């Protein structure tokens, strides 16, 4: 036969049609539907084949790793286990269960167990849990009564206990089962005795208190020791209890130092806040009459001392030496309680400053003293003056000349300008300023930037 006939030309395909295709397909169906009737060709027996002798003999266990290896293709060393071998009642280890203890099922062997192992039925001689009773229907089917919950069920409660013991650690088992599965080792404490109920449950008798308990006293002692060890290892700090430190004493010391630093910082901030609050003007603490009397006394003392300081200095500069003397005199004055707190040395002159555009040569923007503003408010509102202040209008121009930054007369504007060299800011205003005066001061300060050639105009 020409081999060129088997190779079709390019682009052509050859289709072969067999005449016996239907019969061959029917034979396949018959072989599947009737396997016994199908003709199976006999194969050569294993003994008749040319196989080595080692194929029929299991390997002997030897110390060499390759000769004793289990991946050589033979499993003679391992006993085969069917995956559903544990589903038959015959393979159930009844010896460990019938003794009253369910702990034997937890160690039923190292062989793998199928998930459907609960398909077997536990024999009737295995005791039920406390409070359960088994009964049978008229057809012979078993059911279980729970006298505790007063319910009935088809499920065997013993199966649930067996699965629970095998699947979960003993810590989640009830207390009675925990005592059975993992009893504490060691002798019982003094005055305790272990006993067993007729059902096989273990309980403990305390002869000192004449009480019984399901709990093992050895477990309670261990729990108390663990709690004491935890409380001793936990660092003691201020501000409440903290969890024990798992990193040791080094981290505990670092945390303690950090907490101490935070506590010191908080105390320092609190002291600064209290000091700042004590430096604010206390307007509502005293009656208005007492404030007026104190202001009048301060004003008289200032008037008596300002001309004397100017004469002693012998200089006509109203900025440097008279104002320094004025500040020292006002600080030494004991009539104002706020000035006494300033003289303690804890007052900072720039705490309440609202501007930052000035040079560092001046502490803050100088302003008109409190006593003058109070007396101007009284004159503007038409309030009568005290009898001791009858000579006040005649002394105002001399008094105002000694104040830096202002050259104000009542109704007159002087032509000469004075240099603004700020000294100590006046501590506080004893009376609240009117909104008009504050608006005028803000407009002048914003427009002139406190230039040396500027002066304030009072309208």
From Swiss-Prot:
Null mutant phenotype: Embryos are sensitive to deformation by gravity and display a markedly flattened body. Mutants show delayed blastopore closure and progressive body collapse from mid-neurulation, surviving until just before hatching (6 days post-fertilization, dpf). During body collapse, tissues and organs including neural tube and somites become gradually flattened and improperly aligned.
InterPro entries documented for this protein: TEADIR3_omega_loop, WW_dom, WW_dom_sf, YAP1
PTM sites of type Phosphoserine: 21, 69, 87, 119
Biased composition (Polar residues): 307-347, 355-364
Record's keyword terms, sorted: Activator, Cell junction, Cell membrane, Cytoplasm, Membrane, Nucleus, Phosphoprotein, Repeat, Repressor, Tight junction, Transcription, Transcription regulation
Keyword hit for Cell inner membrane: no
UniProt-recorded name of the protein: Transcriptional coactivator YAP1
Stored CDD domains: WW
Pfam families, A to Z: TEADIR3, WW
Domain WW per the UniProt entry, residue ranges: 126-159, 186-219
KW RNA-binding (keyword) present: no
Family in the record: Belongs to the YAP1 family.
Disordered: region residues: 51-88, 103-129, 231-254, 307-364
Record's subcellular location: Cytoplasm; Nucleus; Cell junction, Tight junction; Cell membrane
Molecular function terms from GO: transcription coactivator activity; transcription corepressor activity
Stored SUPFAM superfamilies: WW domain (SSF51045)
GO biological process: hippo signaling; positive regulation of transcription by RNA polymerase II
Transactivation domain: region residues: 247-459
TM region(s), chain numbering: none
Gene that encodes the chain: yap1
Modifications made to the protein after synthesis: Phosphorylated by lats1 and lats2; leading to cytoplasmic translocation and inactivation.
Function: Transcriptional regulator which can act both as a coactivator and a corepressor and is the critical downstream regulatory target in the Hippo signaling pathway that plays a pivotal role in organ size control and tumor suppression by restricting proliferation and promoting apoptosis. Plays a key role in tissue tension and 3D tissue shape by regulating cortical actomyosin network formation.
Cellular component aspect of the GO annotation: bicellular tight junction; cell-cell junction; cytoplasm; nucleus; plasma membrane
Lineage: superkingdom: Eukaryota
Tissue: Ubiquitously expressed throughout development.
